[in-house]
A protein has these predicted regions:
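Transmembrane-helix signature of polytopic, membrane-embedded enzymes
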Residues: 3, 84-106, 125
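Transmembrane-helix motifs of polytopic, lipid-linked glycan transferases
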Residues: 7, 71-92, 129-133
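Short helix- or helix-capping micro-motifs
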Residues: 9-10, 100-105, 153, 157
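Extracytoplasmic catalytic/substrate-binding loops of multi-pass membrane glycan-assembly enzymes
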Residues: 20-33, 42-54, 63-67
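Short acidic/glycine- and proline-prone juxtamembrane loop motifs at membrane-interface regions
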Residues: 28, 109-123
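Specific aromatic-rich, kink-prone transmembrane helix
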Residues: 38, 122-139, 145-153
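Membrane-interface transmembrane helices that cradle and orient dolichyl/undecaprenyl
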Residues: 90-95, 130-145, 253-257
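Transmembrane-lumen/periplasm boundary regions of multi-pass, lipid-linked membrane glycan transferases
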Residues: 166-257
Length: 257
């Protein structure tokens, strides 16, 4: 019963935004990806294929309806929050995990951002999973955790290209963390990378057949153009607000006043 409060919070969160969804028009991005799911491919011009594959699976199970996608979106959001809760509980115990859960449930990303399916949801599931698997490896340095990291990172890369930066962060982390610096030479770390690469092969094959258009578009979008860097401040502030728990704090202060 020690997880009962967390389960209640997650159920309430799900019900609130599942109901809110019924009064909103579907988001254009979700509709775009819904179209992708009707024409399955190894990858797509804008993004890797996970979101399209996921939507196809959801519609096969729940029907080809907006409601099925909206419920699927809520379940993905709940999965991210629950996974983070579980990892925090394992590391720091019930109190810290519950506080983490409440903070996540107060963030606009996990409230308003849960009303439509988008590519970041599966990406975050695999990123969080890979992160906690890395922590588990530090606690219990067995090769199986590295291999699971390889699977999680590969699936994350099938969801969003930025997951490829996980390995960059991992190597920097190992170099800076003296106790695990020797793991740079661990062959199982590179086996994990090979697993990730194998999972990512569909994207590579599709891009090879299409003149690497997706990679070229992503790189061009981020590093070129007359307005490059122009909106950096707005982008940064926007994301800080999107992932900020200040909304809950402001609400608490308001109700207290």
């Amino acid at each position: 019963l020690k997880h009962a409060p967390a389960i209640i919070i997650l159920v309430i969160h799900f019900l609130i935004f599942a109901i809110v969804n019924q009064f909103l028009n579907p988001h254009p991005d979700m509709l775009d990806h819904w179209v992708w799911s009707r024409y399955l491919s190894l990858s797509y011009y804008e993004h890797p294929p996970m979101i399209a594959w996921l939507i196809r699976g959801i519609t096969l199970i729940g029907g080809n309806t907006e409601t099925a996608l909206e419920v699927g979106s809520q379940l993905l959001t709940i999965s991210i929050i629950a996974l983070t809760y579980a990892g925090t509980f394992r590391l720091y115990g019930t109190k810290a995990a519950l506080v983490t859960l409440l903070i996540l449930c107060s963030m606009p990303y996990f409230t308003l951002g849960s009303i439509f399916l988008h590519i970041t949801q599966p990406f975050l599931i695999f990123w969080v999973a890979a992160l906690f698997l890395l922590i588990r490896f530090h606690q219990q340095p067995e090769k199986k955790w590295l291999l699971w990291i390889g699977i999680a990172a590969g699936l994350g890369a099938l969801s969003k290209y930025i997951m490829l930066l996980f390995y960059l962060g991992l190597f920097i982390h190992l170099l800076l963390y003296r106790k695990t610096r020797k793991e740079i030479l661990n062959p199982w770390l590179y086996a994990a990378g090979i697993i990730s690469l194998a999972i990512f092969v569909p994207v590579l094959l599709w891009n090879a057949q299409h003149d690497w258009i997706s990679f070229r578009w992503q790189l061009g979008k981020g590093t070129s153009g007359a307005d490059f860097g122009e909106n950096t401040l707005a982008f940064t502030l926007g994301h800080l607000l999107l992932f900020s728990p200040l909304w809950a704090l402001m609400g608490g202060l308001g109700s207290g006043g």
